[in-house]
Amino acid sequence: MKFLICALFLAASYVAASAEAEVKVEEGVLVATVDNFKQLIADNEFVLVEFYAPWCGHCKALAPEYAKAAQQLAEKESPIKLAKVDATVEGELAEQYAVRGYPTLKFFRSGSPVEYSGGRQAADIIAWVTKKTGPPAKDLTSVADAEQFLKDNEIAIIGFFKDLESEEAKTFTKVANALDSFVFGVSSNADVIAKYEAKDNGVVLFKPFDDKKSVFEGELNEENLKKFAQVQSLPLIVDFNHESASKIFGGSIKSHLLFFVSREGGHIEKYVDPLKEIAKKYRDDILFVTISSDEEDHTRIFEFFGMNKEEVPTIRLIKLEEDMAKYKPESDDLSAETIEAFLKKFLDGKLKQHLLSQELPEDWDKNPVKVLVSSNFESVALDKSKSVLVEFYAPWCGHCKQLAPIYDQLAEKYKDNEDIVIAKMDSTANELESIKISSFPTIKYFRKEDNKVIDFNLDRTLDDFVKFLDANGEVADSEPVEETEEEEEAPKKDEL
């Protein structure tokens, strides 16, 4: 009898343990936990895992696209599974896989994880995981294969080669292997080539917008083909959002014409849509991007350009490869002719950078901490008769706010020193051509006599500031201050 009771107890325990390790499914996505994670990975050769936090805005934006991708893969009977881990609950897993931010996505292939580097729309996710689990380019041996391939993928690139061993075909395969975010197909079938009216050694990008397809022209080499994929896979005029940001800033076109508009105000139809022909004409050199003033998330972008949302519709041009150089048209006219003239001047190198600047306050030198703006920066900071310590700050920066009372004390201490000036400049509203600020606060010391610029990298304490100034900036073994808050970074390219 005792044996029977023990056996029943063990059986019940086994069932309970199995139930705990069960994998729930939410909208096609497997719910991974500490209890079932190891088995889930072992049972599936390919698993994309999202580590998320319920409060994370980016995670919330990703959720419907992630579920859509999971469902579409399941419909295709794909062996690829999508899973998610609530990292705020499953802390052990988050620590094991070095999760430092949300969402973090890792792709497990036969148990080995690699970082996910694709986009955040369903089509991008499917393209990326498909590429990771198969050949660089899918072999399309019939018209039916090609039609199904294009049906399964919103954006797809097909190479048409009579000889798959040709140098052109090998170049195509190399590019297909290098670009994880794109889906490639290849065909040597005569019926397929005829169906799509392709030339031998031709490459066509199929897409659901604009002209529906783009035909590659020019010398077929790796550089040209990569640029073709990145440029032609985007709409002629791209709307900036969380999903498109990585494609906009990760592409090969580094000069962007930005349209600040209100969709609710009808600006797209009135001002943007008529510019598609111009966008097509300049698409190899300039990317056209719309930024909506209706989105709260875009407030920081407006601040970065020294604008407010009441100024829409308006345009700016930014050149990412040269320290985020910005350009502003002289006219408020948004006609196609005026905008094209503006672009021509830019491409001909005839435009001068637009630098933000505030008006100089009348009482800028009233207090111990002197106030600098673009117009008085050189006359104060580069005055060779004095050494000048300048804090470049942002009004919203938490570290800057913490520094303020210490910086005031420092200025009070040196207010009667004829050789040292303590100053500050709001770098969100004032820009300098010679100095680019990428994080806040940035503190620089402009030494008297030779104007040598020395970065202050000690702890931001009164004692360390005094030590630094008394040593005329020559302090050995300065250690950079480690910033811990994300808000202290100046706007990054992928935030614009």
UniProtKB/Swiss-Prot annotation:
Catalytic function, reaction form: Catalyzes the rearrangement of -S-S- bonds in proteins
Chain positions covered by the region annotation Disordered: 473-496
Disulfide bond entries: C56-C59, C397-C400
Complexes and interactors: Homodimer.
Described function: Participates in the folding of proteins containing disulfide bonds.
Designated name of the protein: Protein disulfide-isomerase
Organ and tissue specificity: Expressed in all head and body tissues.
Thioredoxin domain sequence ranges: 19-134, 349-474
PROSITE patterns, alphabetized: ER_TARGET, THIOREDOXIN_1, THIOREDOXIN_2
Site description Contributes to redox potential value, residues in chain: G57, H58, G398, H399
Keyword Signal belongs to the record: yes
Family statement drawn from the similarity comment of this UniProt entry: Belongs to the protein disulfide isomerase family.
Database matches in InterPro entries: PDI_thioredoxin-like_dom, Prot_disulphide_isomerase, Thioredoxin-like_sf, Thioredoxin_CS, Thioredoxin_domain
Subcellular location: Endoplasmic reticulum lumen
GO BP annotations, alphabetical order: protein folding; response to endoplasmic reticulum stress
Motif extent (Prevents secretion from ER): 493-496
Bias (Acidic residues): 476-489
Site (Lowers pKa of C-terminal Cys of second active site): R460
Signal peptide as annotated in the record: 1-18
Organism (species): Drosophila melanogaster
Swiss-Prot/TrEMBL keywords: Disulfide bond, Endoplasmic reticulum, Isomerase, Redox-active center, Repeat, Signal
EC assignment: 5.3.4.1
Residues annotated as the enzyme's active site: C56, C59, C397, C400
Site (Lowers pKa of C-terminal Cys of first active site): R120
Listed NCBIfam families: ER_PDI_fam, pdi_dom
